[in-house]
Amino acid sequence: MQEKNVFNWLHKDLLDIDQLSQTDIFNILNTASSLDETNSRVIKKLPTLRGKNIILFFAEPSTRTKVSFEIAGKRLSADTIGVNASSSSIQKGESLKDTALTLQAMSPDVIVLRHSSSGAALFLADLLECSVINAGDGWHAHPTQALLDVFSLWKVWGNHFHGKEVLIVGDTAHSRVCRSNVTLLNLMGVKVRLCSPRTLLPSGVEHWPVEIYTDLHQAICGVDAVICLRVQLERHKKSFFPSIEEYAKRFCLTPKHLMSAKTEAKVLHPGPFLRGVDLASSLIETPQSLIFDQVSAGIAIRMAILFLFLTCNDL
């Protein structure tokens, strides 16, 4: 690995993509690429973060993000400690602020936060001395997911992002993944399209740097990749469509839809995915699918982020 500070990494926290420069993005991608090969070793361990403590504070359910952060930390020899809201003092009425200050008193180097409230990561970052990494806050942002999505495409496209077209289809209104991906893909020179029912388009989307569609057959024409999103029923406070079956008839990605995309178009999904609602089961394990590649990419990207924050930070 590179010597300390070679990246001139100047960030205390990772809250969203818009704080990163294009140089930062490529530092993350190149570091992830270097670390990715360790995942195929018999012994998947590096001593890089020995002696560092990482707290995974997850106040929302998670499989992929939590486990991949834990594996990422352990593969770099850090000590990772998991805290769930359901088993923390939050259940006894303790505030997020007091819980965070309690954790800080234990001298962690990084707190990785997943929370249902938009802005929770910024709140902790302003409060705490240690680094805070946003692992998803409400509808707001999920920067490491966007980075691993781009890393998955980078392994296929190389540096040839400029002029590519990517469609994001599904519940874009309630998706933090959508928001972070729109920012990152635009930074990479990609033209982004969104496709949702009108009731599931984000507020103010007309001001986003995207093309907006409500017809999947039209939206998918000629695209280089499709990112499918789950319908987030747990975030819906009212009905946005007649039924899940009616939604699937119009917005479930099928092989027929994909025939209108570029021949080598890739299919992605941040997970968890709903077969037959977000996309057809037959697409999940095809050569065009990067869905399980994204899971592997998540480990490498999160290793890279932990490495940069804990060994290359000049602050």
From Swiss-Prot:
Keyword Signal: no
Biological role: Catalyzes the condensation of carbamoyl phosphate and aspartate to form carbamoyl aspartate and inorganic phosphate, the committed step in the de novo pyrimidine nucleotide biosynthesis pathway.
Alphabetically ordered keywords of this record: Pyrimidine biosynthesis, Transferase
An individual GO BP term: amino acid metabolic process
The protein's Enzyme Commission number: 2.1.3.2
Binding residues for L-aspartate: 92, 176, 230
Family: Belongs to the aspartate/ornithine carbamoyltransferase superfamily. ATCase family.
GO molecular-function term, one example from the UniProt record: amino acid binding
InterPro entries, per the entry: Asp/Orn_carbamoyltranf_P-bd, Asp/Orn_carbamoylTrfase, Asp/Orn_carbamoylTrfase_sf, Asp_carbamoyltransf, Asp_carbamoyltransf_Asp/Orn-bd
Organism: Lawsonia intracellularis (strain PHE/MN1-00)
Catalytic reaction equation(s): carbamoyl phosphate + L-aspartate = N-carbamoyl-L-aspartate + phosphate + H(+)
Residues in coiled coil: none
SUPFAM superfamilies linked: Aspartate/ornithine carbamoyltransferase (SSF53671)
Lineage, uppermost ranks: Bacteria, Pseudomonadati, Thermodesulfobacteriota, Desulfovibrionia, Desulfovibrionales
Class of the enzyme per the UniProt entry, highest EC level: transferase
Record protein name field: Aspartate carbamoyltransferase catalytic subunit
Entries under Gene3D superfamilies matching the protein: Aspartate/ornithine carbamoyltransferase
Annotated HAMAP family: Asp_carb_tr (MF_00001)
Residues involved in carbamoyl phosphate binding: 64-65, 114, 142, 145, 271-272
Protein encoded by which gene: pyrB
Any one annotated GO CC term: cytosol
Pathway: Pyrimidine metabolism; UMP biosynthesis via de novo pathway; (S)-dihydroorotate from bicarbonate: step 2/3
Assembly information from the UniProt record: Heterododecamer (2C3:3R2) of six catalytic PyrB chains organized as two trimers (C3), and six regulatory PyrI chains organized as three dimers (R2).
